[in-house]
């Protein structure tokens, strides 16, 4: 249901009619085929109900897979989808159930794996998200969005992080999003006078704030925990995410729900 809300808010007011397919994969080829109908009904019940409330059509698709990531990319590439939206899983979520699951997993790691010298990065949220994001982005032939749920309800106060000329594509997504939510957006420009394409970046942001209502340029130039005060959604590029997830880990503890986008 949350992923449906994200997709609707991000794309319902785009140039093209919104056509959605909800894909659910069960990992493990030993699933009894007689049980798949029941799995499908249970899996898609909430999202079909949500789509009906929003007044949109949605296709549902259930697959059994031995390698979910590879199969998702294969479906996207072979069947001509023009955007892939995936969830980041529980590792970066701050919902109570997900936090409990993460704590359990950390406890399980400490109790059972450390004695075998297993690499702790297996259970490190940043590494897990980075690996998943990298795979989808590198193997998909369309733009990819990886959604991190931090109690998402509505993207009404959006922060858009710009670090290079390549990040300006985010402003187009922000403009479409605001048409759906009628909210506001603020741009945090991390670029400096020595950043390649600095003038193009300034012009792009200026044009965005002049042309799109309820948009502003923030005075600050760096991400801190306080940067996210008052915001409930962040748009950030995959490249910039990789940088801030490495160098601004403390700030990201306070981040709102986030969509990490590839061009």
Predicted features and spans:
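Intrinsically disordered or low-complexity boundary/linker segments at protein termini
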Residues: 1, 87-196, 202-263
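Charged docking surfaces used in two-component/phosphorelay signaling
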Residues: 63-69
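Short, well-structured alpha-helical segments in soluble
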Residues: 71-79, 224-226
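Short amphipathic alpha-helical segments
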Residues: 4-8, 73, 130
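Short beta-strand elements in bilobed, periplasmic/extracellular small-molecule ligand-binding domains
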Residues: 54-61, 185-188
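Non-transmembrane accessory domains of multi-pass membrane transporters/channels
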Residues: 1-44, 52-57, 167-169, 178-181
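Short, surface-exposed alpha-helical segments at coil->helix boundaries
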Residues: 41-45, 198-202
């Amino acid at each position: 249901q949350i992923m449906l809300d994200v997709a609707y808010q991000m794309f319902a007011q785009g140039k093209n009619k919104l056509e959605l397919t909800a894909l659910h994969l069960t990992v493990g080829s030993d699933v009894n085929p007689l049980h798949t109908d029941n799995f499908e009904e249970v899996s898609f019940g909430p999202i079909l109900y949500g789509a009906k409330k929003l007044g949109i059509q949605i296709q549902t698709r259930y697959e059994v897979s031995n390698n979910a990531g590879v199969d998702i990319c294969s479906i996207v590439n072979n069947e001509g989808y023009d955007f892939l939206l995936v969830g980041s899983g529980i590792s970066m979520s701050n919902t109570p159930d997900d936090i409990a699951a993460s704590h359990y997993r950390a406890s399980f790691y400490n109790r059972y794996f450390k004695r075998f010298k297993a690499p702790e990065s297996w259970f490190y949220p940043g590494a897990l998200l980075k690996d998943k994001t990298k795979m989808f982005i590198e193997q998909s032939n369309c733009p990819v969005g990886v959604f991190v749920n931090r109690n998402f309800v509505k993207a009404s106060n959006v922060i858009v992080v710009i670090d290079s000329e390549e990040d300006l594509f985010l402003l187009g997504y922000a403009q479409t999003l605001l048409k759906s939510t009628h909210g506001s957006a603020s741009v945090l420009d991390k670029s400096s006078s020595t950043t390649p394409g600095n003038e193009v970046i300034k012009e792009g942001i200026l044009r965005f704030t002049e042309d799109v209502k309820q948009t502003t340029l923030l005075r600050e130039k760096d991400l801190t925990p306080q940067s996210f005060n008052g915001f409930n959604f962040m748009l950030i590029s995959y490249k910039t995410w990789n940088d801030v997830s490495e160098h601004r880990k403390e700030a990201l503890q306070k981040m709102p729900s986030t969509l990490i986008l590839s061009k």
